[in-house]
Regions:
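Ferredoxin-like iron-sulfur electron-transfer modules
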Residues: 1-18, 29-49, 67-77, 182-208, ...
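Gly-rich Lys/Arg/Thr-decorated short loops/hinges at beta-loop-alpha junctions or inter-strand turns
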Residues: 1-6, 111-117, 147, 216, ...
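Local cysteine-cluster metal-coordination motifs and their immediate loop/turn environment
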Residues: 17-28, 45-59, 143, 148-157, ...
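A short, flexible N-terminal coil/short beta segment enriched in small residues
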Residues: 36-38, 62-94, 249-281
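Short Fe-S-cluster ligation motifs
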Residues: 50-61, 84-86, 229-245, 263-268, ...
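Mobile, glycine- and charge-enriched loop segments
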Residues: 82-125, 266-308, 399
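Cofactor-cradling patches in redox/metallo enzymes
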Residues: 119-173, 303-378
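Peripheral docking tails and interdomain loops at the edges
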Residues: 175-191, 197, 358-406
Length: 409
């Protein structure tokens, strides 16, 4: 841990009642308890900033930087006044889909909601019971919690913990006269989308899947066991015809997003232009408030579900699209929420660096490991990279054509 790191989670010992609830509920055993004194402290090396301990503390002795109780309540109040919406949709980072997907998920559950307040969180299990009642007091009539399926929770026990809280909250709300539909839980886990008509049966996805979710078939295209798929994106990278992709992170959609951003910013004579590919678990603020990057550093953030889903083709293509530098931000091996198959991602980066070196572009790409436990770490590394790229001349490359072997057809 960096000595200059400002911890995102702290226990206020003056408020702590030594009840040890946080110690017993932490899914990462990141809270140490002294058996003699009962004093509890957070081990920042193990903490994943899921916030479950924060929401469980009965005396609010735990301070947290991201998505604190007052901040969440203020956000709901502001959005309610701005949109007039009476529906609050809570989403875990692991399953928080694009806007269109939210509506699709709700419709599949028989819920038709045209206007809602989206609230994205590191884990749905961190929602305090008090916040549910606060949201209702602020004018919310319906709360929908889109949670990961139990076995796919990125914070181990987060979904189970939240399910228990929701059950207790619903029981209490009904006793107070609220409708049974006031609080609803929807289970959703991001998976791959498989278009078998595009598949040529090369079976690359079978060999690359670190979770054994894809099985080769003797006289047919591979079979995906969706009950095992975790949506890491490793298979999507090796598919030569984009027959298999992670829902919400389709290759062409990502390509269009950064290409159009580069075109717009170039027209405004912005320099330098920085593109950040960011694992959704390594950094919170940049992804949940992407406008801050554009305003402060002229940087665009593109979210990826995991380090394994960082496509080297996108790095090369983004430089051809007009960006002066590309920065990748991922979790360390110890912090990765999807640890299986990390060696594949590292090999991809080695190949990428070799290609960039041959193109004399290696200095315009950096890979950093970052954790949300250390406040400001991402901004520090972005500043360093920004200054480095700013010291170079603007990058002027010919726009890559479709025949380029690096570009997927």
């Amino acid at each position: 841990m960096n000595e200059t790191c400002t911890a995102a989670v702290n226990i206020n010992q003056d408020y702590c009642g030594r009840c040890s609830i946080c110690h017993s509920i932490c899914p990462y055993e990141a809270i140490k308890r002294d058996l003699e004194t009962g004093k509890v402290e957070i081990d920042l090396q193990k903490c994943q900033v899921c916030g479950i301990c924060y929401s469980a503390c009965p005396v609010m002795a735990i301070d947290i930087v991201y998505y604190d109780y007052d901040g969440l309540a203020k956000y709901v109040e502001c959005m309610h006044e701005k949109t007039g919406s009476e529906t609050l949709v809570l989403m875990c980072r692991g399953n928080s889909p694009a806007t269109g997907e939210i509506e699709e998920i709700l419709q599949n559950e028989g819920l038709k909601v045209d206007n809602y307040i989206p609230l994205r969180l590191p884990c749905s299990g961190r929602i305090p019971t008090e916040f549910i009642f606060k949201a209702l007091k602020l004018g919310t009539k319906n709360i929908v919690s889109i949670q990961c399926e139990n076995e796919f929770c990125r914070f181990k026990q987060g979904t189970k913990i939240n399910a228990q809280r929701i059950m207790l909250s619903k029981a209490l709300l009904q006793q107070l006269g609220f409708s049974e539909d006031t609080l609803k839980v929807v289970k959703y886990s991001r998976k791959v989308v498989y278009e078998t008509e595009k598949c040529v049966g090369c079976d690359k996805c079978v060999f690359i899947c670190p979770y054994g979710a894809i099985e080769a078939q003797e006289f047919a295209t591979p079979k995906i066991t969706y009950e095992v798929c975790v949506g890491c994106g490793a298979c999507a990278l090796v598919c030569p015809h984009s027959a298999i992709q992670v829902k919400g992170f389709e290759f062409e959609d990502v390509l269009q997003r950064y290409s159009k951003s580069a075109e717009r910013l170039k027209a405004e004579s912005k320099f330098p232009l920085i593109l950040v590919f960011c694992c959704q678990w390594s950094e919170f603020t940049a992804l949940d408030d992407p406008k801050s990057l554009t305003l402060k550093k002229k940087a665009i953030a593109i979210e990826i579900p995991c380090f394994k889903a960082l496509d080297p083709v996108h790095v090369v293509e983004s430089l051809h699209s007009g960006f002066d530098g590309v920065m990748a931000v991922v979790c360390s091996k110890e912090d990765c929420k999807l640890r299986e198959g990390g060696d594949t991602a590292e090999r991809n980066i080695d190949v990428l660096r070799d290609v960039l070196k041959k193109m004399n572009l290696l200095e315009r790409f950096e890979l950093f490991t970052v954790s949300p436990r250390c406040v400001g770490e991402f901004n520090q590394k972005l500043d360093v990279f920004f200054k480095k790229i700013a010291s170079m001349p603007p990058l002027k490359l010919a726009v890559a054509e479709a025949k380029n072997p690096c570009i997927k057809s």
